[in-house]
Amino acid sequence: MSKSENLYSAARELIPGGVNSPVRAFTGVGGTPLFIEKADGAYLYDVDGKAYIDYVGSWGPMVLGHNHPAIRNAVIEAAERGLSFGAPTEMEVKMAELVTNLVPTMDMVRMVNSGTEATMSAIRLARGFTGRDKIIKFEGCYHGHADCLLVKAGSGALTLGQPNSPGVPADFAKHTLTCTYNDLTSVRAAFEQYPQEIASIIVEPVAGNMNCVPPLPEFLPGLRALCDEFGALLIIDEVMTGFRVALAGAQDYYGVVPDLTCLGKIIGGGMPVGAFGGRRDVMDALAPTGPVYQAGTLSGNPIAMAAGFACLNEVAQPGIHETLDELTTRLAEGLCEAAQEAGIPLVVNHVGGMFGIFFTDAESVTCYQDVMACDVERFKRFFHLMLEEGVYLAPSAFEAGFMSVAHSMDDINNTIDAARRVFAKL
């Protein structure tokens, strides 16, 4: 047995499923998950000594690559001053100033510890501000594991074949209305059925939890218009897309102005950080200035703030997003060319530093139904053969891939060459 296999066997006796987040267990592809020893740049190194070109990037945060010196040094320096104070720090102010400067639609921002906390808190705030209970989300979109959001969710819920989770009371779920991503007609129908009851729409501007599904040109502006028409708030979940699709997020890339924005992943530079923010009048409803309660023992933790501050300053440097786009475009085009040579039907969606691989005869993948029609069994074989080639992709057909600026063009070309060999075996 390999060291990963031994560790996984031990872990399953102590940790449910052997992992602390379900998709890591390789449930969606089968086999034994890799246990990682270290990471640097674009590479992961497992406990058995094998190196992999990494396109998971810790599920999105590692836009600069692993073990970036600016982030590592910031964490070390902050740790020398203390790990947690439970009181305000200067770095929280600096971090809030940086985030609101980078994302102009955020007049104010509240730091939390995860993307789930950010979306959960933003929805509570929207409900409190509007005095309404219902929310709209979209099939296949995942916004964390808060009870009200585990309805036709994507990501790990799809990987496990459970779009709805046991343990979520029907009384909670009844306030969550589910519409079809990229379909404004379904959204209007929900508003017309409940014209005075919908507090907000929450949407991934690029659906990254049913792999990678970009919005159609009219979709996000249409959501903004419907929210304005019916008096609801628009919450854009930029946990994946924030600082990745563009410096100011997908909202800037697609030209839509939300009322609230949720952030995570890149904002922490690899540390557990989330944030939500937006219009000043809405944020003023949040405790302690307003009646909507939200709190966190470790929110604004000095180590995490130092990591995030260092990361965002690096991400804001000129040329970062152009590099991400160039690398991702080359990968997507190269994979499609290699698949075509082998007679394998393939669609690769990509936006900025995100991409999604779909084994499908369809010309495009634009919604949940398109994703569910893809060949998951072929993806499983592709995943394991690529792993043997030293390429680490997301271990699920329903998870997006992530590029970093630490990837070189040689890494991309080597990945395409590996895929060419793999396609010949599929």
UniProtKB/Swiss-Prot annotation:
GO terms for molecular function: glutamate-1-semialdehyde 2,1-aminomutase activity; pyridoxal phosphate binding; transaminase activity. It catalyses: (S)-4-amino-5-oxopentanoate = 5-aminolevulinate. Pathway: Porphyrin-containing compound metabolism; protoporphyrin-IX biosynthesis; 5-aminolevulinate from L-glutamyl-tRNA(Glu): step 2/2. Its EC number is 5.4.3.8. Gene3D superfamilies: Aspartate Aminotransferase, domain 1, Type I PLP-dependent aspartate aminotransferase-like (Major domain). Its cofactor is pyridoxal 5'-phosphate. It is an enzyme of class 5 (isomerase). InterPro entries: 4pyrrol_synth_GluAld_NH2Trfase, Aminotrans_3, Aminotrans_3_PPA_site, PyrdxlP-dep_Trfase, PyrdxlP-dep_Trfase_major, PyrdxlP-dep_Trfase_small. The modification N6-(pyridoxal phosphate)lysine is found at residue 265. It is found in: Cytoplasm. It comes from the Bacteria. NCBIfam families: hemL, PRK00062.1. PANTHER family: GLUTAMATE-1-SEMIALDEHYDE 2,1-AMINOMUTASE, GLUTAMATE-1-SEMIALDEHYDE 2,1-AMINOMUTASE 1, CHLOROPLASTIC-RELATED. This is Glutamate-1-semialdehyde 2,1-aminomutase. It comes from Salmonella typhimurium (strain LT2 / SGSC1412 / ATCC 700720). The gene is hemL.
